[in-house]
A protein has these predicted regions:
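Exposed, low-structure sequence patches enriched in small/polar residues
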Residues: 1-192
Length: 192
């Protein structure tokens, strides 16, 4: 089952979503990523259900003067529980996004994750990470140019931790907009 609620005003927003997905759930189309868990030590996939709680609260500041059109501050929590109600994953995020009156934007985001790996996991051909609790955080900043123009661009940089290591990421993109018929975007991302 899944149930949710949403409340929005000009300045304030709130979202809550609750879900319970059993290991025997199969979608009619696509797939549910979290059900299939890969055990790198046994080289097999194990189906595990989950319970999910997502909340987001946001607040908008709408200046009447100056170059800023809107400042949005938001906080998100996504908590995943195992079928026995033990914690599987908890992701918290704080975001500040500034939309300028010229349709460009600037954003800052801070993410904190707590992940309890149920099974040894490998992201590379190296030694699998052991099944245990990991806590890691990332910080990112991004800018997007005026979206109304024929050509636009965006870039984002983030850095922090990832499981037992560090991560640095840079992404950039260009956009060609010929409304109402065409909107073409080319993105590139580098992760280290």
């Amino acid at each position: 089952y899944e149930i949710g609620a949403n409340y929005d005003t000009r300045k304030f927003g709130f979202v809550i979503d609750l879900a319970n997905v059993g290991k025997n759930y199969y979608t009619d189309m696509g797939f549910v990523q979290r059900i299939e868990n890969y055990d790198a030590l046994r080289d097999t996939a194990i189906r595990v259900g989950y319970k999910h709680i997502f909340t987001e609260i946001s607040y908008n500041i709408l200046p009447t003067k100056g170059k800023i059109g809107r400042i949005e501050a938001s906080a998100q929590n996504s908590i995943i529980f195992n079928p026995d109600n033990s914690l599987n994953e908890w992701e918290s995020a704080l975001n500040i996004k500034t939309d300028f009156k010229n349709a460009s934007s600037l954003k800052f985001e801070l993410n904190n994750n707590i992940t309890n790996l149920l099974f040894a996991t490998s992201f590379t051909d190296g030694i699998p990470l052991p099944a245990k609790q990991y806590q890691y955080a990332t910080f990112g900043i991004g800018y997007g140019s005026d979206t109304r123009k024929l050509f636009g661009w965006m870039s984002e940089i983030s850095f922090g931790q990832f499981y037992n290591g560090t991560v640095q990421s840079f992404s950039a993109g260009i956009n060609w907009r010929s409304q109402p018929h065409l909107n073409l975007r080319l993105n590139a991302q580098y992760n280290d």
